[in-house]
Every structure is written in structure tokens, then in C-alpha cells.
Regions:
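Helical "lid/coupling" subdomains associated with nucleotide-phosphate turnover
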Residues: 6-9, 23-26, 46-77, 85-135, ...
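Short aromatic-hydrophobic micro-motifs that form the base-stacking/packing surface
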Residues: 10-12, 81, 137-139
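A common structural microfeature
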Residues: 18, 77-80
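Ser/Thr-glycine-rich phosphate-binding loops at phosphate-binding pockets of nucleotides
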Residues: 16-18, 85, 142-148, 214
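Beta-strand-connecting loop/turn residues
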Residues: 17, 29, 144, 153-154
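Early-domain small/polar-rich strand-loop-helix modules and first-structured segments
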Residues: 1-38
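Short coil-to-beta-strand
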Residues: 31-41, 156-165
Length: 310
């Protein structure tokens, strides 16, 4: 990009639970959002158990991809990147999905490794945060995996573990509310993964824990007492650890219908918020963080910034 010129980019993040699009104009250190959207497609449905995509999950995701491509064409986008993460890494039939996306977009989707996923999440989450809050520990709780990224202006260490909210729901929390046995088994699994991440990433050196993605922002909405979801109220809100634990316990005690009735709850997150909030609660306990900074900027924004730098 020539200095002083703006470039219009389209970033697509394809996770285990959601497909998201960001179209933005970027000039220097300024990002102007043109369009942002999320669809719950649950591409990773059953992948933890079957190690393969369900045909209906591929179909849902490709339909949404086509709708996104129609928008991208209408917005005169100059650069586009499609990044697929945890579920696509794990699926034995991922080539069926990759070929389908290529046929729609005319470019190959990138199945990025956990380390790159972590770096992009870090870039997106920390871009607009004051350096006086560094070093940062960015925690990205996705549908299939959770990334832990430590850094200041650059990533110093990162590790990805398979404790996403969809994976934990399918593996452990199969009823709502979950049983004590299900919760205990989930905690055992989650804690082991966090401790593994801690052997690669020194949690104690971080000054600020930034939590990104839908689990963290939904927990923030609950902690803030929002009547409906408000991304502007959530972004950069400080949520004390005790409130995280209380929110996780609240979700674990509710029925599916009670969760669905919450005004800030996205319909596609109803069956995974209990597991997701449990992961975040265990992260707070095992890292020793006293609060987290909620961020609406994440891997999607990181993909966009990366495109502008090409």
C-alpha cells in the first residue's frame, strides 16, 4: 500500500461456530469499518467426535460464503482473505469445503495453523490498546480451540489448545443445565489444557488479560447487566474475575429456555455459552488474572490489518 492511500479489504474468519466478515477501509493506522457481520453456521458440528465435516454443515457455510461474496463484489473490495481455523484443521474431509469456497470466491481459503491464528488475534485485539497496559495476554476462546498469546508490540509466545466452546459442549456438557459430573469432567479437561498452554506461555508476566470472541463478549454483556447486546458498551470494558465466575455459575444453573430469553444472547450461542463461560472462568483462576479487558476487535480485525500491509 502506498503511503497516504486507502485500501479496501475484506476479511473472512471461518471458525468452528461462526462465519464472520469485515469489510474495511484502511489507511496507515486507521481502520474505517464499512461492513461487519456474523453468521452462526456451526461448521464444526460433530467434528470433535467424527473428525469430519457433516454435509449439512458444509452446505450452511457455503451458502453464507456466497452471500458474503455477493456483498464483497458490491463494495468494490481490493483485497480479500478467507481464513479457516480449528474445525477445518481437524476435519478429514476439509478438501470438500476448501474446494467449495474456492469455487465461490475464486481464491483458495487458507487453513491457518494455531500459531498464526494466535498472532492474528493478538494483532486485532491489541491494535487500539495503549502500550502502557502491556505486556498483554490475549485469550481467544473459539468454537474448537482457545488461543493464548503473550506479547507487547509483537508476539513473544503463543499456544493453541482444543478447548473451544462447541468442542466442550459436544464432549462434556450435553445437557442444560449440565450435571455436576459433566461439569467436573469438563473442568478436568479444561484445566489440563490451560496448564499445557501455561508451559508454553508465561501467564505471570502479563500485565493485562484481553479476552476476545463471542464467549468473552457475551460474558461481558452479562456482567455489565446489558438488556441487549451493545458492542460499543462491551468494547474495552473491564470485567472483574469474580463476576466472570458468577456469570459462569449463572449459566450453568439455567435451562436452555432461560438462556434463550436473555436479550443479549445470540441464538447461535445458546447451547455453547455454558461451556464457553466455564472455559473463561477457569482461565481467570489458573492465570491468576483479577480482571479481563473485553475486546470486540479480534482475529477478524487482525486479518484485515494484515491484508492492508501487503
Amino acid at each position: 500500500m502506498v503511503e497516504g492511500e486507502s485500501v479496501r479489504v475484506a476479511a473472512i474468519d471461518c471458525g468452528t461456530n461462526s462465519l464472520r466478515l469485515l469489510i474495511a477501509d484502511i489507511e496507515g493506522n486507521n481502520l474505517r469499518e464499512v461492513y461487519r457481520d456474523m453468521r452462526i453456521v456451526r461448521l464444526g458440528q460433530g467434528v470433535d467426535r467424527n473428525k469430519a465435516f457433516a454435509p449439512e454443515a458444509i452446505e450452511r457455510t457455503l451458502v453464507a460464503t456466497q452471500e458474503y461474496f455477493d456483498l464483497i463484489r458490491a463494495k468494490d473490495v481490493q483485497r480479500i482473505r478467507f481464513c479457516a481455523t480449528s474445525a477445518t484443521r481437524d476435519a478429514s474431509n476439509r478438501n470438500l469445503f476448501i474446494d467449495g469456497v474456492r469455487d465461490i470466491l475464486g481464491i483458495s481459503p487458507e487453513v491457518i495453523p494455531g500459531v498464526e491464528e494466535a498472532a492474528l488475534s493478538f494483532l486485532g485485539a491489541t491494535k487500539g490498546v495503549g502500550r502502557e497496559l502491556a505486556p498483554f495476554l490475549v485469550v481467544d476462546i473459539g468454537g474448537g480451540s482457545t488461543e493464548f498469546v503473550l506479547g507487547e508490540s509483537e508476539v513473544l509466545a503463543a499456544h493453541s489448545v482444543n478447548i473451544g466452546c462447541v468442542r466442550m459442549s459436544e464432549r462434556h456438557l450435553t445437557s442444560q443445565p449440565p450435571t455436576e459430573k459433566q461439569l467436573a469432567e469438563a473442568v478436568f479437561d479444561i484445566d489440563a489444557a490451560i496448564l499445557e498452554a501455561g508451559s508454553h506461555v508465561n501467564f505471570k508476566t502479563a500485565h493485562t488479560l484481553i479476552a476476545v470472541a463471542g464467549t468473552a463478549t457475551t460474558v461481558a454483556a452479562a456482567a455489565l447487566g446489558l438488556v441487549e447486546y451493545d458492542r460499543y458498551a462491551i468494547h474495552l470494558a473491564r470485567i472483574p474475575a469474580q463476576q466472570v465466575h458468577e456469570v459462569a455459575e449463572m449459566f450453568a444453573a439455567m435451562t436452555r429456555e432461560e438462556i434463550a430469553a436473555l436479550g443479549y444472547m445470540h441464538p447461535g450461542r445458546i447451547d455453547v455459552i455454558t461451556s464457553g463461560s466455564l472455559v473463561l472462568s477457569r482461565v481467570m483462576r489458573l492465570t491468576g488474572a483479577t480482571e479481563f479487558l473485553a475486546s470486540e476487535s479480534d482475529i477478524l480485525d487482525g486479518i484485515a490489518w494484515g491484508l492492508a500491509a501487503l
